[in-house]
């Protein structure tokens, strides 16, 4: 099984946190590594978005790739927009939702999520997303999929058919814009729904529909770690698309 370079716990700066698509944390917590570093584990899969899945009870950030955020759009060659973020989530769901995958544990990221390379059968799903043009090779942290990205770019596949803002830039820009209008510059929305306490990042597809008015304990957070420590969980992006009423009420 081919794997990208091993990464352990990442503790760096605010800029690093924004690139990963999250706010600055206090500490890493929440998602412990299920097995020792560089060993395999398996389980049934639930899709969060184009580069994040749950395998059993473990939240996985797919190593070496960065997919468009679910609310993100890209442009075709003719300049028209398409929902590249939704398409990336859909492609991931088609590959793995409800299926057993085998993942190689590369350690934890800053937020305690397990970094992993995952396979369904013999298919490397990290690699496949880059081949489909539905994820960037995350070369700041791994060069495992540079060749696949070059091939997708050459054939103008997926995000390479027209203009597409890299996901890390999209997150940073969206965070900055939301923080300018959020109370005390803390733009994470902590909603209370029939499904429990759920927080939405500024790039969540339902972010603009959530109203934080103090009703039923709804509140703002400055960091994901703060939200998690208070008992909120991240919104499941795909489920939010298919079951939006429960996520938003």
Each model region followed by its residue ranges:
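Bacterial N-terminal signal peptides
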Residues: 12-22
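Solvent-exposed, polar/charged alpha-helical surfaces in well-ordered, non-transmembrane soluble domains
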Residues: 86, 90, 94, 127, ...
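Bulky hydrophobic/aromatic "packing anchor" residues in well-ordered structure
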Residues: 62, 129, 152, 199-200
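Bacterial N-terminal signal peptides that target proteins for export
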Residues: 2-12
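Electropositive
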Residues: 29-138
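Mature, structured domains enriched in cysteine- and short glycine motifs
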Residues: 27-28, 135-143, 154-249
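Bacterial Sec-dependent signal peptides at the C-terminal "C-region" and cleavage site
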Residues: 20-31
């Amino acid at each position: 099984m081919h794997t990208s370079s091993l990464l352990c716990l990442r503790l760096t700066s605010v800029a690093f946190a924004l690139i990963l698509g999250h706010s600055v944390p206090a500490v890493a917590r929440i998602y412990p590594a299920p097995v020792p570093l560089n060993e395999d584990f398996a389980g049934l899969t639930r899709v969060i978005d184009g580069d994040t899945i749950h395998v059993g009870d473990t939240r996985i950030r797919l190593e070496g790739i960065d997919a468009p955020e679910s609310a993100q759009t890209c442009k075709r060659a003719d300049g028209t927009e398409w929902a590249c973020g939704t398409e990336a989530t859909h492609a991931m769901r088609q590959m793995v939702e409800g299926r057993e995958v085998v993942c190689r544990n590369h350690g934890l990221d800053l937020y305690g999520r397990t970094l992993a390379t995952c396979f369904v059968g013999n298919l490397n799903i990290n690699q496949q997303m880059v081949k489909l043009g539905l994820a960037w090779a995350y070369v700041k942290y791994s060069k495992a999929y540079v060749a696949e990205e070059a091939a997708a770019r050459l054939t103008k596949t997926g995000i390479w058919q027209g203009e597409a803002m890299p996901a890390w830039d999209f997150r940073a820009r969206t965070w900055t814009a939301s923080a300018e209008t959020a109370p005390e510059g803390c733009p994470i929305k902590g909603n209370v729904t029939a499904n429990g306490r759920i927080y939405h990042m500024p790039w969540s597809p339902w972010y603009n529909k959530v109203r934080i008015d103090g009703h039923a304990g709804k509140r703002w957070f400055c960091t994901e770690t703060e939200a998690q420590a208070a008992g909120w969980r991240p919104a499941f992006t795909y489920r939010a698309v298919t079951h939006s009423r429960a996520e938003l009420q």
